[in-house]
Amino acid sequence: MPGSTRKLPVWLPILVLLIAMSSIQSGASLAKSLFPLVGAPGVTALRLALGTLILIAFFKPWRLRFAKEQRLPLLFYGLSLGGMNYLFYLSIQTVPLGIAVALEFTGPLAVALFSSRRPVDFIWVVLAVLGLWFLLPLGQDMSHVDLTGAALALGAGACWAVYILTGQRAGAEHGPATVAVGSLIAAIIFVPIGAVQAGDALWHWSILPLGLAVAVLSTALPYSLEMIALTRLPTRTFGTLMSMEPALAAVSGMIFLGETLTGIQILALCAIIAASMGSTLTIRREPQIKQVDVK
């Protein structure tokens, strides 16, 4: 009903975020299988080009009007979205998926840490940090991790932090439709880079269907869902809930790639999940939950 408002259930944006993270992990596995054919920059170009077309067709962003104070955050939102994709795909060329995701998570973890105000919030962040610490193959195995790939994953994490902070401001009015504009900004910068490096193979008929699947799983679906969660969850809660990402990556590697987990790593996953659950349970103590118009 026009002009009416309804308070969304607290659990709904959390469920939306979990679906988005699962979709991204599925897309990352598929994307990595395309690296031998078109390279990481080429997959980035496919993901952004096809994903942007889907988002534009669905959200029709030319109808949106952004206030002057939203334009700069929107620009940085789009640039960080593209940089996050590009650097992450470069990193998983040489770094295992689970490790790359864990290193990339330093971005949202930093957002959660610096946004914490109450002791209980800090507890969940510390618990997530401990989980990530033991999840990473520190010690003997760490010598086998490519340092350049690890640095690229950390760079992707920095872009992720900017994505979270600017996404909340840029999407405050238009919600998930903002993703279409942000993705277009990212595509303008990073699609030409990937297209030049991949060459004609990028647009081969056998590659395009797989690229479309990557675009849907890794861009169109999850970023739309994440924007819903971004504009309806506190910053620290969103950042801490994203700690599920490396846990999902590790479990995905175990199921689909045959990777085994040690007892300590299993405990680390439990710590990360506990941090996410704790953060979720404390949402109800927030003064307000964002309301949305139901048109």
UniProtKB/Swiss-Prot annotation:
Cross-referenced Pfam families: EamA
Gene (name only): rhtA
Annotated protein name in UniProt: Threonine/homoserine exporter RhtA
Residues in the Cytoplasmic compartment per record: 1-7, 60-71, 115-118, 168-175, 222-237, 284-295
Bilayer disposition of the protein: Multi-pass membrane protein
Superkingdom of the organism of origin: Bacteria
Function: Involved in the efflux of threonine and homoserine.
Domain EamA: 30-135, 159-278
Organism: Salmonella typhimurium (strain LT2 / SGSC1412 / ATCC 700720)
InterPro entries, alphabetized: AA-Vitamin_Transporters, EamA_dom
UniProt-annotated location(s): Cell inner membrane
Membrane-spanning segments: 8-28, 39-59, 72-92, 94-114, 119-139, 147-167, 176-196, 201-221, 238-258, 263-283
Family from the record: Belongs to the drug/metabolite transporter (DMT) superfamily. 10 TMS drug/metabolite exporter (DME) (TC 2.A.7.3) family.
NCBIfam families: PRK10532.1
